[in-house]
Amino acid sequence: MKIQTAPLLLALTVMPLGAVFACDAPVAPPSPDGGSATLEEMIAAQGEVKAFQAANAEYLECVDNQMSAEQASIDEGDESAKERYALAAADYNAAVSREEQVAADFNSAIKAYKAANPD
């Protein structure tokens, strides 16, 4: 099977940068009910939070790279890159807020767990 490279190269050169940077935001894990969760459930939830934080760090790096590329396009006079940059910045800020919320929810679950299990 012979692959035709010319159409593929053309498609890649006219693709917007957002399509090149396929940054996939991770799904936030559910927060456990600390008041009724077992220790094992809390430990599992902690692992999910840590995995989410690691995946979110990769996502933020991807979006940051996208923003850098858009800034370079802006510097070269590409006016349409301003909108793409703003969208990427909004995505970045939303991801930071989402991670902060996941951490706050898990901290609340830990407090509830400790209150329900004072030993």
Regions found by a protein language model. Name each.
Residues 16, 32-33, 75:
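Intrinsically disordered, low-complexity segments enriched in small/polar residues
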Residues 2-22:
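Classic N-terminal secretory signal peptides
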Residues 20-68:
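Immediate post-signal-peptide N-terminus of mature secreted/exported proteins
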Residues 4, 39-42, 74-81:
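Short, structured coil/loop segments at alpha-helix boundaries
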Residues 16-17, 56, 100:
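Processing junctions and N-termini across compartments
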Residues 66-67, 71-119:
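Compact alpha-helical subdomains of small soluble proteins
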